[in-house]
Amino acid sequence: MNQKVVFLDVDGTIVNDKGIIPESTKIAIRKAVENGHKLVVCSGRSLFQLPQMLLNLGFSGMVTAAGAQVIADGKEIYHAVIDEEHRKFSVDYMEKNNFVYCFQTDAGVVMNKRSEQQILNIMSDMGITEEHLRQLVGEFFIQEDVWNNEKEEKLIYYDAPFGVARVHADLEPYFDVVALSLSGADDYCGEVGINGIHKATGMKRYLEYVGIPREDSIAIGDGPNDLQMMDYAGIGIAMGNAKEEVKKRADMVTSHIDEEGLYRALDRLGLLN
């Protein structure tokens, strides 16, 4: 078997909705690595939001912030950030329409005081505790001039007055907007990134760097922001807990994350033999 590169989403694929990595998932990742395959985190999370328990599993690389940063063999090979003009533009839009929002940087999450309290309330309503939220998003930086950070990679919003399609139409062509990939999120929560930068472009940059063809890549995910990743890969796999639209686009559907979903997928592909 050729060496494979397996790109793994984090939330709902590696880490369950309780913030736990199932033991079967840990075993699967370690076995695949021992068998000579490259496993790469491919997440909407920024690098600082990846817990140490995940980093300890032996990943060969990271595609973070939905493609805005790519790390291979321990070094950064790509990093895109939102320019000042569009940081200001997006903040003006969010404030004018009373969105609850924050920016992700490579060091923490930036938000104003108004959004901080409302995000805590929204997460509580979704069944996510403040402790789990801080595991998900990392450190909070509170500042009123939210746009004033040159390391801002993407924007997350909640409780919007209209759906993702409308927000996308309002913010293009510079930005691309997809539904937020988080258990309990609805069409009024989204991820805003630079148009043309997404998980699949991060995969492409990683594969070109390591010299492995696209047909030897596998992508596994569960949310709308995983669709481009799964379409780009040689094989796209949906978790059993994935949204229905994701399952329909997948080449294969495995079981739920808490029912050995990742282990069964990699085993079925022969990566654990």
Feature names for model-found ranges:
Residues M1-V5, P22, C189-N273:
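Mg2+-dependent phosphoryl-transfer enzymes with acidic/Ser/Thr/Gly-rich catalytic loops
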Residues Q3-G19:
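Asp-based phosphoryl-transfer active-site loop
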Residues K18-D125:
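Active-site phosphate-binding/coordination module
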Residues T25, L50-L54, V167, L171, ...:
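Hydrophobic packing residues within well-ordered alpha-helices of enzyme cores
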Residues V33-E34, E95, E172, D231, ...:
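Anion (oxyanion) recognition and catalysis
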Residues L57-G58, A66, P173-Y174, Y232-A233, ...:
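Short, structured coil segments at secondary-structure junctions
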Residues F59-G67, M123, V177-L180, G236-N241, ...:
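Short hydrophobic/aromatic-enriched beta-strand-loop microsegments
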Residues Q104, G108-I220, P224:
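Conserved acidic, metal-coordinating active-site core of Asp-based
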